[in-house]
């Protein structure tokens, strides 16, 4: 019984500690570029890191290393901060991420954000064949040319700048497209680049007009696209209601943990009482048995003397 009791005590203590400990995780922050992730050379880039209310520190990381730190000043409790990157150049272009801290607890790292610097090289020219006005169901090819030798060309549709098509060539690259539908309508620009993060000036826009009644969405581009309006910083201040809800949620969690811990302690006390009663009954039985044995021996001794 004693070994079982010790095992139950250890289990109860472990459970009570796990119940009493708060969940040691924070939501992953969201990193965004304000206005656009394509920033002209020598202009300022602004990145937003959106975390949780009550965060005391935000860190911006560039290519895995610490780049900048921002600490929100009370009493303005907001759910994120803005990092300003002045004088954009090729050394500051690359992959960014952010984390934040509440008390001594750090969040997970955000997803990666690619920040691109533009206007690094000459301006390419963009054309489309067979022409800028086609019928739905036809195939078209965009041609991007940059007389300054490069290694990669990029084609973007205005309003969907995250849907980047890449093609490789020294002076010119082709971007075949189609069969086109009305979903392909819009203005396109191209860039030249030596890497993923330093691009040339944008070409003049070429507007593709698609006529016809075919509205087969299965022929539209399958890559995920994001409107440019997605690139915006949605930072909000904490309202009184949000504070009250957060306080109530924290209080409810503490009460739940305390209640569960109390139940565990009650169960342990019951086990201790049961063990004590069991030991007491065992001792009483042993005492009665010893007394009875003594009397039996005494009576036997008297009988032998007679």
Swiss-Prot record:
Residues 1-21 form the signal peptide. Keywords: Cell membrane, Disulfide bond, Glycoprotein, Immunoglobulin domain, Membrane, Receptor, Repeat, Signal, Transmembrane, Transmembrane helix. One of its GO terms (biological process) is immune response-regulating signaling pathway. It is found in: Cell membrane. Gene3D superfamilies: Immunoglobulins. InterPro entries: Ig-like_dom_sf, Ig-like_fold, Ig-like_Receptors_ImmuneReg, Ig_sub. This is Natural cytotoxicity triggering receptor 1. It comes from Macaca fascicularis.
